[in-house]
Amino acid sequence: MEALWTLTLALAAGLAAASPPNILLIFADDLGYGDLGSYGHPSSTTPNLDQLAAGGLRFTDFYVPVSLCTPSRAALLTGRLPVRMGLYPGVLEPSSRGGLPLDEVTLAEVLAAQGYLTGIAGKWHLGVGPEGAFLPPHHGFHRFLGIPYSHDQGPCQNLTCFPPATPCEGICDQGLVPIPLLANLSVEAQPPWLPGLEARYVAFARDLMTDAQHQGRPFFLYYASHHTHYPQFSGQSFPGHSGRGPFGDSLMELDAAVGALMTAVGDLGLLGETLVFFTADNGPETMRMSHGGCSGLLRCGKGTTFEGGVREPALAFWPGHIAPGVTHELASSLDLLPTLAALAGAQLPNITLDGVDLSPLLLGTGKSPRHTLFFYSAYPDEVRGVFAVRSGKYKAHFFTQGSVHSDTTADPACHASNPLTAHEPPLLFDLSEDPGENYNLLDSVDEVAPEALQAVKQLELLKAQFDAAMTFGPSQMAQGEDPTLQVCCQPSCTPRPSCCHCPEFQP
């Protein structure tokens, strides 16, 4: 698939950009910093993503503010820290009463106001609510095809993950309805046939792009793939072909989907008019061992504030506008809303944003205005505030806590058995020389360097000022759960949850 779209790159580089550009935002799930070939994995089969990296701008220091699904997705779409919106602690469940508050302004709403045709394919995980109140159509998306939460939030022991009949690994969440596939607010299938899901999303994406072109308007597509979240699945062409087992097969299908999306853009003659941005929601779920991803040389993974949890691969691709290369500038998923709004000529919402405009960095006219990053625990509170702060090359951990998602690694600091620990003084790392956070500069047998002492004072001040200014929004998760809010294809059926069963045809 990659050959079809890469052949047009030379032509695309000479094309004038549409004003505003089309935007394709691809968001992977539980993907580690070291999982792509372009980030050094020796055996990953990711030719399309590697081509994006070769033809675009590859970030080495791109972060998410929280290493967990729901809060990370909220940050991406709003440019705001999840604690401001009440999206804590943990993640939203299928029966949660809460969700992304309707007064929050999403990237889709910003771009829709600028005339974009907006759509989301894939994973939502920002709430369902009463009568679907929190679903994408109520947050600025004109079209939605996807699962409203994570595909393991329902029983999966009877589902097929790899054709022709390989069952899904594990049993996932019991006592819940089967996972639903929604088209806008309607149930398409419950459960969907997982091996055919990615192809359906690609077809949906192609239709959205085509319709936008016919309507003479730009498109914004948020392609939120379920890959590579557990339990992994893939279509017919991928099982056993990756060399990395089920995880690699899932990653291989994600890469092929990227190739298919780029082919669709190329077929429409829009490569020079389309900005593509790829990243992921959090680091790998290392507890899954061979069924989880790889954080490379970084410490820990999902659920922690160590680098393996919060540093992500990120690629920006726009032929003729974004010069190929590598940037070591600091950047965050929080920055995408103000950046893409600037490139689209759209007005920013009149609300406190935590993101900054990276368009000068992307277009080669300046550097990143971001110098500081604040990282929250997946289970934050106002007493402790941020767990870690990065400023320039230095990062300080004021609190650390392991996570079940990062169990089974060789490092006990990552494990769920590692309790919440306050560090006084904080752990201090020079990430320019020690990205693996192995050598605490304040734990030296020799005299601590004056530069390190100055750095920790600055980081302590940054944390104190930031915590003092931050106001947590009322917790959406604290609203509790109502089993009747779970999506059901037969709303009045009994007995629940088993009666909510409207499976689609399996080839």
From Swiss-Prot:
The conversion to 3-oxoalanine (also known as C-formylglycine, FGly), of a serine or cysteine residue in prokaryotes and of a cysteine residue in eukaryotes, is critical for catalytic activity. This post-translational modification is severely defective in multiple sulfatase deficiency (MSD). Ca(2+) binds at D29, D30, C69, D281, N282. It is found in: Endoplasmic reticulum; Lysosome. Keywords: Calcium, Disulfide bond, Endoplasmic reticulum, Glycoprotein, Hydrolase, Lipid metabolism, Lysosome, Metal-binding, Signal. The keyword Signal applies. Its cofactor is Ca(2+). GO terms for biological process: lipid metabolic process. The keyword Metal-binding applies. GO terms for molecular function: arylsulfatase activity; calcium ion binding; cerebroside-sulfatase activity. SUPFAM superfamilies: Alkaline phosphatase-like. It is an enzyme of class 3 (hydrolase). Disulfide bonds join C156-C172, C161-C168, C300-C414, C488-C500, C489-C502, C493-C499. One of its GO terms (cellular component) is endoplasmic reticulum. It holds the Pfam family Sulfatase_C. Glycans are attached at N158, N184, N350. Residues 1-18 form the signal peptide. Its EC number is 3.1.6.8. The modification 3-oxoalanine (Cys) is found at C69. Substrate binds at K123, S150, H229, K302. InterPro entries: Alkaline_phosphatase_core_sf, Sulfatase, Sulfatase_CS, Sulfatase_N. Binds 1 Ca(2+) ion per subunit. Belongs to the sulfatase family. Hydrolyzes cerebroside sulfate. Homodimer at neutral pH and homooctamer at acidic pH. Exists both as a single chain of 58 kDa (component A) or as a chain of 50 kDa (component B) linked by disulfide bond(s) to a 7 kDa chain (component C). Interacts with SUMF1. This is Arylsulfatase A. It comes from Bos taurus.
